[in-house]
């Protein structure tokens, strides 16, 4: 069990009524809480959401606070400070004065910094500190009026092959405020991608998806991501750039196995972070299984850190892998099914 969940179980006497667990790990915590606790989970991680559903838990997959009332909330500290600001805002705009909010996190995950953010809403008390985790309690003294989701957007422009795109990114989304180096290295090659039905695996704020849709109005883009905030950001990016929703298919996925089949191309700057931890499962799975989702002669385009062994993995499953460029620590890899 996650050590943060163990802290919650140790201090379960503080819990009562309808309790919302926000960003909780997908372990056995919910099933081990006392039966008198009416626990629900709010997550934006689609893989976690599936685990909660399969375990019979009441779970919500969304960027927005669930549409019901709660007596308490437990926030598992996210990696992003901006995302925590958003979560605190929506919690304080749904809960009432004198209700309880708990904050739990790992020291290396920034729980002490997060506790300072919590102080804006009342006096806080540290309830537990063990196994490199801390649990803080707040009795709400100040609530907030909900702001529209759009007010949390960060926008920036990107120039790609004579096209200027406006990128919209919500809190917690990869490269929320600027173009990342890996995607920048890949972008000049996107005009070579085969047209048709194209999947953007790990779409993030929708930079790749948006360019491919604008480059050819007959392209259908399947924007795939595990994160609800990424999918929402991609939808907002399309809207901001005047691209019709008929070109966009948004799909939450747990990995490449959930992707559509018979695709003309898969393009990806694959994700490798899960919370504060590095995880290459999704990107390695992409290299190994992408071919199953492509038509004959369909294309795989990936940008990845040069130290990763993706060319070998791709060659093993496609029979070949071409390195299009090796620049600023990143390689653009190409394979044809």
UniProtKB/Swiss-Prot annotation:
GO cellular component: cytoplasm
Keywords: Cytoplasm, Methyltransferase, rRNA processing, S-adenosyl-L-methionine, Transferase
UniProt catalytic activity: guanosine(1207) in 16S rRNA + S-adenosyl-L-methionine = N(2)-methylguanosine(1207) in 16S rRNA + S-adenosyl-L-homocysteine + H(+)
Chain coiled-coil ranges: none
Tagged with keyword Ribosomal protein: no
Predominant location category: cytoplasm
Disulfide bonds: none
CDD domains tied to this protein: AdoMet_MTases
SUPFAM superfamilies: S-adenosyl-L-methionine-dependent methyltransferases (SSF53335)
Assigned EC number: 2.1.1.172
Localization annotation: Cytoplasm
UniProt enzyme class: transferase
Signal peptide: none
GO-annotated molecular function: 16S rRNA (guanine(1207)-N(2))-methyltransferase activity; nucleic acid binding
Family annotation (Pfam families): MTS (PF05175), MTS_N (PF08468)
Assembly and binders: Monomer.
Role this protein plays: Specifically methylates the guanine in position 1207 of 16S rRNA in the 30S particle.
Protein family according to the UniProt entry: Belongs to the methyltransferase superfamily. RsmC family.
UniProt name for this protein: Ribosomal RNA small subunit methyltransferase C
Taxonomic source organism: Acinetobacter baumannii (strain SDF)
